Amino acid sequence: MLKIEKQAKAIKITEVKESNYKGQFIVEPLYRGYGNTLGNALRRVLLSSIPGAAIKGMRIEGVLSEFTVMDGVKEAVTEIILNVKEIVVKAESSGERRMSLSIKGPKVVKAADIVADIGLEIVNPEQVICTVTTDRTLDIEFIVDTGEGFVVSEEIDKKDWPVDYIAVDAIYTPIRKVSYEIQDTMFGRMTDFDKLTLNVETDGSIEIRDALSYAVELLKLHLDPFLEIGNKMENLRDDIEEMIEEPMDIQVIDDKSHDMKIEELDLTVRSFNCLKKAGIEEVSQLASLSLNELLKIKNLGKKSLDEILEKMKDLGYDLEKNGSPE
């Protein structure tokens, strides 16, 4: 097993919750750089791709557009629409549904006054919709749909709607905030590892752990096809697995070899060119590389790797021990 794989098996996740809908996930230890890689990927997926429900249209009895003036109602229609956008809806299944309210004033109309279809739930019933100041009646119908992200009212398909329905900006994403921080952490005696702290807050329609789990599943679905590309890395890993050992022995070398140029190693042209293109000019540079770092050199194949290891061993350097001599 490669060193990075051993380290990956040691990763732990700690959940620090303020509530079911707000908290932190602390992930450590991560290989250097993986904190940003995972943090950025998870943040983008959480913000863009977690499905949710939202009101995308509404009909107010007697109102033909958002610019209509309503008698006996304190707020303008445009303000009512803004308030309706803040209503958080939870849906048990996907698809378009209906909700409605019918009240008689005077009254402060809230989301709690809405009668929802089976399978729909109002998460924030205290959200104010409008204030009716007279004894007039107010009837409103709502269209609820499911989706991802945010869809502005101009992009909502209204071709099958009655003329008096008004489109509403649909905030489908249940994620309110996502941020992440990277700090140094230890793994064994090494301190150059990442600790990822992922801060997540939802609108209350989904728990943070469910949102994160779904984001990971989405990422996995998009990465799975890459596993079919080939098994070259798997074969290479099998070839070198037995060569990697944890203990590092102290080796005795000739001090003069440390200042040698790689030209003096008498390598084949392919091996020499790979090292030169990687910016390796001297034996001292080569001696400082671990086996994993050698494997990352572009176009360096198994035969070239074996040749370099053998040449360095002749000089007293055993790079198979994953380090350079003291």
UniProtKB/Swiss-Prot annotation:
- SMART domains in the cross-refs: RPOLD
Q: Which GO terms describe its biological process?
A: DNA-templated transcription
Q: What is its EC number?
A: 2.7.7.6
Write out the catalysed reaction: RNA(n) + a ribonucleoside 5'-triphosphate = RNA(n+1) + diphosphate
Q: What class of enzyme is it?
A: transferase
Q: Which InterPro entries match?
A: DNA-dir_RNA_pol_insert, DNA-dir_RNA_pol_RpoA/D/Rpb3, DNA-dir_RpoA, RBP11-like, RNAP_asu_C, RNApol_insert_sf
Where do the record's region annotations for Alpha N-terminal domain (alpha-NTD) lie? Answer: 1-230
Q: Name one GO cellular component term.
A: DNA-directed RNA polymerase complex
Function of the protein: DNA-dependent RNA polymerase catalyzes the transcription of DNA into RNA using the four ribonucleoside triphosphates as substrates.
Q: Which HAMAP family match?
A: RNApol_bact_RpoA
The name under which this protein is listed is: DNA-directed RNA polymerase subunit alpha
